[in-house]
Amino acid sequence: MRIVARRVEGYAHDVEIEGGHRLRADEPGTIGGTDTGPSPTRLLGASLASCIAITVEMYAERKGWELGPVEVDVEVGYEGPVPTDFEVGLKLPAELDDEQRRRLLVIATKCPVHKVLAGEAHVKVVERLEAA
């Protein structure tokens, strides 16, 4: 998968994601951005919330469990500008039994974004030279 971020103005960047998707990332005006899109750290929280929701829904579907809409909320705690804590709330239907609930809470920790945040990925920054 390839993702490319290109500066628009100030800190605003248009992001192209393989598959034809586009979005804008920016910083709030309070730190010099123009607030034309969510900040990268807010996008990280959004990625976690949506990844958990999709993972839980896919698992329940494979098991034949009727979930209806799942709601996931993420509270992000910071140390300075760095997000250090993610508290995830998973709202499940009251009709599920205790074992189903327990299983879905475990499955929520198996989503790819959760795994990355838990330190299971490697990030390497390399310089790419422009062609002359």
Identify the role of each PLM range.
Residues 1-46, 54-132:
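Extended beta-strand/beta-hairpin segments
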